[in-house]
């Protein structure tokens, strides 16, 4: 009996130098059921992409025939094949012959070479493949016109030739010593349960009762839309709904058919880091017509959908609300025409609409931010930072045009974040007659002070007070008139591109989850909501009112009522505009306070460095100098003051370019005033400080408390003092946000994206990423949410063996559902102090051991890289906002003392007096100077900016041992993260 040439083929390579033959061979094998898993075209690819590629290949396609393997049922009720290394009996001695639970997989590499090839036609290459469906394969080959060649080998059924002339043989025997296999069901283990007709009927009935939700992305694309799609899909599935993607915006709703597709849990894996929207977006003309909305209604009812989550701008949301209002008439019309049944009419007679604002313009009223706005702002400041380098080198001026249509939010915030000299926005247009002169004065004044570059931001909707457009060309001409070498840069659609920033991932995720909850809680009497954010709080606003108020802004601008337009923007818009003027325009001397009210303000950095220390110092300095105050930098923390008396007065030119500088220009460390309180008091008296701003983390908070507690012994500390939290750990009591934490999260999101890419390339690798944060789990919780981590370990939620077992079960289930085809990497996030026992290395080791060859684990520790380099847009904007509020706090407290006619000069200096022998604060009039509320921590809590006395925080709201506040304000992030990773489903089960 002749022996087969190959009995256990797993990989082979076919080569040709004929391009047409290459394509024909590719088509031949795909018709036989092979799938393309990798393609290569000769170009300048990096080395890691060339692994396995032949050096003389012009083009390669790798084809794979996935093995028949053990079938298991997933938690979602789907049946998937297990990979070889997960099958029963893998690595056992029995597998040396063949696995009874998995056939061999095959990889074919097709190569197009640039070399001359000489093939022996008399002795062509020959390979043998196994198939469990020999008759179907024979029929398929006959169908495509392939030659059937009888075999002389007993174990080989027949042969054929591929277009390259290679002989391909087929056998029903997996190996020489095995028995003949005639059905793929042989490999289905355990055996598939035969379902009764009754069970099928019950399933149909149960599915009919499920809420069906469609998700649409409409209008201009925005970074973060994919995160919203992911959140809506997984939250919907978690809450027992069926979720459909409506492709190409409202166009898909009108066309129906394949444009409405149900989404499964794994369909949205890996979307967090992808910009734009994978389900497409379009501005639909058809949906604007009633017939289009009627057809959309029919398509929704036909699919059983009566809830719509719309992610788009004001136009998209307006269309959605109109659709809801017309729905009763539309569905009644469909019933009358006989297109739907009475049962369908009764079931879907009401439409639920929930809006998510996805727009880079941030032009929707009733919310602080829209999905995509801060990613766009991040792109702008990144590009302007690059421009700054060449502008300073050549002493040039740059006019930068940004998007925003009729909203100046991008223009205003980019002006603040980039340290621009001047901005043009539609809400606050300059005088038609004076703007050119005003622009010249500001730019020349800054040049005279020593600035080498000039930056002017122009919003695309910029106008003057007579509604005449102001173009970038006009601005350039004005700057040229004063002798500046000027260039125009239009950033254009690059502002929409790229991966979403950390905040937009967070915003889209939590709003997407709340949108599903809003759908389930909705009744016909509840107006359609739009999910918004005010400070750090997710709220629901009436969609109609938000859209109407947004349109009112445009109407106010058209009516030249610019004050009204400014007020109609979000609550901080007008304040931010004033903040910009205070650091860019008011240095002209027009805002100087009387000499008797001028102060000496000290600024000190305490604790670990973060990226936002310098921007906050810059704004506090420029704002104070504009009013005539003197600003002193205490260098190298309290250690520098105590040891060297390191105090330096800051001038305008010293700080003007600190807006994009990370670290600390004046130096920082963890030293505290308690090291030598007397010396600290001495230097405070020497420089006659009237106020102190301490910028830093928990050490800054501790330093403020120590200074406050020392007031009884050192009256100089009775000055108003403010702690501005700036730490990546976000562990300062009294605030839910700290400067520098957003930069850290952006850095972590990029780091984890890279790690996940590495994990996805190897398919079977999981990374355990260790993040900083001390005993505060904020950073880990937030990072887990925005990176799609399977599990997050924090100090607030103790780790035990059961927790780890559940997470390994989730990991195993995820790999099962991927079936080796999904490229999304898996990561765990582990806080550095989460557990003394279950460390990062131990968690990784446990995962690796539990994998037993099915998957492996690695650790990744970004360390101090997390602090970031250049501050993020959010940190720059908030540094400006909070630093100015700190300055105002110091000014107000001093005003009450210095202008109190009932106090003597000494009492004003001491800031207290004795009333019938009782020591009384000159600020508050309270009987104890310690309780006069002039030692405070500024913070964001809920939807408010607060000033909280440090003593109150220290005594009531601080966990001293763990160096953090008692309020775990980020706990909701863990719940949402667990819900979307599948972790919550396992624990619920």
Swiss-Prot record:
Q: Which SUPFAM superfamilies match?
A: Phosphofructokinase
Identify which residues the record assigns to the active site.
361
> Which residues does the record give as beta-D-fructose 2,6-bisphosphate 1 binding sites?
670, 727-731, 772-774, 832, 864-867, 963
| Region spans: Interdomain linker | 586-599
- Pfam families given for it? PFK (PF00365), Pfk_N (PF18468)
InterPro entries associated with the record: 6-Pfructokinase_euk, ATP_PFK, Pfk_N, Phosphofructokinase_CS, Phosphofructokinase_dom, PKF_sf
- Chain residue ranges for the region called C-terminal regulatory PFK domain 2: 600-989
Provide the alphabetized UniProt keywords: Allosteric enzyme, ATP-binding, Cytoplasm, Glycolysis, Kinase, Magnesium, Metal-binding, Nucleotide-binding, Transferase
Q: What's the domain of life for this entry?
A: Eukaryota
UniProt subcellular location? Cytoplasm
Question: Which E.C. number(s) belong to this protein?
Answer: 2.7.1.11
UniProt pathway: Carbohydrate degradation; glycolysis; D-glyceraldehyde 3-phosphate and glycerone phosphate from D-glucose: step 3/4
- Does the record carry ATP-binding as a key word? yes
Q: Which residues bind beta-D-fructose 2,6-bisphosphate 2?
A: 765, 858
Q: Which residues bind beta-D-fructose 6-phosphate 1?
A: 359-361, 403-405, 460, 493-496
| Gene3D superfamilies linked to this entry | 3.10.180.90, 3.40.50.450, Phosphofructokinase domain (3.40.50.460)
Subunit structure, as described in the record? Heterododecamer of 4 alpha, 4 beta and 4 gamma chains. The gamma chain bridges the N-terminal halves of the alpha and beta subunits.
- This chain's protein is named ATP-dependent 6-phosphofructokinase subunit alpha
What lineage does the source organism belong to? Eukaryota, Fungi, Dikarya, Ascomycota, Saccharomycotina
Gene it is expressed from = PFK1
């Amino acid at each position: 009996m002749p022996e087969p040439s190959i009995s256990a083929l797993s990989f082979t390579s076919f080569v040709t130098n004929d391009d047409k033959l290459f394509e024909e061979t590719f088509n031949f094998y795909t018709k036989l059921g092979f799938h393309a898993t990798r393609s290569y075209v000769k170009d300048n690819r990096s080395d890691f992409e060339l692994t396995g590629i032949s050096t003389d290949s012009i083009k390669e396609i790798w084809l794979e025939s996935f093995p028949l393997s053990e079938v298991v049922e997933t938690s979602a009720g789907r049946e998937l094949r297990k990979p070889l290394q997960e099958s029963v009996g893998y690595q056992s001695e029995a597998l040396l012959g063949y696995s009874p639970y998995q056939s061999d997989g095959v990889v074919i590499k097709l190569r197009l070479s640039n070399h001359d090839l000489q093939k022996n036609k008399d002795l062509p290459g020959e390979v043998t493949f196994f198939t469990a469906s020999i008759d179907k394969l024979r029929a398929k080959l006959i169908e495509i016109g392939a030659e059937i060649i009888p075999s002389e080998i007993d174990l080989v059924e027949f042969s054929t030739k591929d277009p390259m002339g290679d002989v391909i043989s087929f056998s029903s025997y997996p190996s020489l010593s095995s028995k003949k296999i005639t059905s793929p069901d042989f490999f289905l283990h355990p055996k598939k349960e035969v379902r009764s007709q009754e069970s099928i009927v019950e399933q149909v009935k149960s599915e009919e009762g499920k809420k069906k939700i469609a998700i649409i992305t409409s209008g201009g694309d925005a970074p973060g839309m994919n995160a919203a799609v992911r959140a809506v899909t997984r939250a919907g599935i978690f809450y027992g709904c069926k979720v459909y993607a409506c492709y190409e915006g409202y166009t898909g709703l009108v066309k129906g058919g394949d444009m409405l597709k149900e989404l499964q849990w794994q369909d949205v894996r890996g979307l967090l880091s992808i910009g734009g929207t994978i389900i497409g977006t379009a501005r639909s003309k058809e949906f604007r017509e009633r017939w289009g909305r009627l057809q959309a209604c029919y398509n929704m009812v036909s699919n059983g959908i009566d809830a719509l989550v719309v992610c788009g701008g004001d136009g998209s949301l307006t269309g959605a609300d109109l659709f809801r209002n017309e729905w009763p008439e539309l569905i009644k019309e469909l019933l009358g025409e006989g297109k739907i049944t009475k049962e369908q009419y009764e079931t879907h007679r009401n439409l639920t609409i929930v809006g998510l604002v996805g727009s880079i313009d941030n032009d929707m009223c009733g919310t602080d931010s829209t999905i995509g706005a801060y990613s766009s702002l991040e792109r702008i400041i990144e590009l302007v930072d690059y421009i700054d380098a060449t502008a300073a080198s050549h002493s040039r001026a740059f006019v930068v045009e940004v998007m925003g249509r009729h909203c100046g939010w991008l223009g205003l915030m980019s002006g603040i974040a980039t340290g621009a000299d001047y901005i043009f926005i539609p809400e606050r247009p300059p005088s038609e007659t004076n703007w050119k002169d005003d622009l010249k004065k500001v730019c020349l004044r800054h040049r005279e002070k020593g600035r080498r570059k000039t930056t002017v931001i122009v919003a695309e909707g910029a106008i003057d007070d007579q509604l005449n457009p102001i173009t970038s060309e006009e601005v350039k001409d004005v700057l040229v008139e004063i002798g500046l070498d000027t260039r125009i840069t239009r950033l254009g659609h690059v502002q929409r591109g790229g991966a979403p920033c950390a905040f937009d991932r967070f915003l889209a995720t939590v709003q997407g989850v709340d949108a599903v909850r809003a759908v389930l809680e909705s009744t016909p009497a509840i107006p359609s909501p739009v999910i918004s954010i005010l400070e750090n709080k997710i709220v629901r606003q009436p969609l109609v009112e938000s859209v109407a108020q947004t349109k009112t802004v445009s109407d106010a601008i058209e009516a030249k009522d610019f004050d009204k337009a400014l007020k109609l923007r979000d609550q901080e818009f007008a304040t931010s505009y004033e903040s910009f003027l205070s650091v860019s325009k008011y240095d002209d001397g027009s805002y100087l306070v009387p000499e008797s009210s001028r102060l000496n303000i000290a600024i000190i950095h305490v604790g670990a460095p973060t990226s936002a220390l310098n921007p906050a110092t810059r704004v506090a300095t420029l704002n104070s100098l504009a009013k005539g105050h003197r600003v002193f930098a205490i260098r190298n923390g309290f250690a520098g003051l105590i040891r060297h008396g390191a105090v330096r007065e800051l001038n305008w030119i010293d700080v003007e370019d600190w807006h994009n500088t990370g670290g600390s220009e004046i130096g920082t460390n963890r030293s505290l005033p308690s090291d030598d309180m007397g010396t600290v008091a001495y230097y405070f008296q020497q420089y006659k400080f009237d106020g102190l701003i301490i910028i830093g983390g928990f050490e800054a908070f501790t330093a403020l408390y120590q200074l406050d507690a020392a007031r009884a012994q050192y009256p100089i500390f009775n000055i108003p003092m403010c702690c501005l939290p700036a730490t990546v750990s976000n562990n300062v009591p009294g605030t839910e946000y700290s400067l520098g934490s957003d930069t850290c999260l952006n850095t972590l999101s990029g780091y984890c994206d890279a790690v996940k890419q590495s994990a996805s390339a190897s398919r079977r690798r999981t990374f355990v990423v260790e993040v900083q944060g001390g005993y505060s789990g904020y950073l880990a919780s937030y990072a887990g949410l925005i990176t799609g981590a399977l599990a997050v370990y924090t100090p607030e939620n103790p780790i035990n063996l059961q927790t780890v077992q559940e997470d390994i079960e989730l990991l195993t289930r995820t790999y099962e559902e991927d079936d080796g085809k999904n490229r999304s990497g898996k990561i765990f996030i582990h806080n550095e102090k989460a557990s003394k026992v279950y460390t990062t290395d131990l968690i990784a080791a446990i995962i690796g051991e539990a994998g037993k060859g099915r998957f492996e684990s690695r650790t990744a520790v970004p360390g101090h890289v997390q602090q970031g380099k250049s501050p993020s847009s959010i940190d720059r904007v908030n540094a400006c906002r909070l630093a100015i509020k700190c300055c105002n706090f110091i000014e107000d407290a001093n005003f009450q003392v210095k202008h109190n006619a009932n106090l003597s000069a000494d009492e004003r200096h001491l800031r207290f007096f004795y009333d019938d022998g009782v020591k009384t604060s000159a600020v508050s009039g309270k009987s104890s100077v310690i309780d006069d509320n002039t030692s405070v921590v500024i913070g964001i809590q809920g939807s408010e900016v607060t000033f909280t006395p440090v003593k109150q925080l220290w005594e009531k709201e601080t966990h001293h041992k763990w160096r953090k506040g008692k309020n775990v304000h980020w706990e909701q992030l863990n719940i949402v993260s667990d819900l979307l990773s599948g972790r919550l489903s396992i624990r619920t089960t």
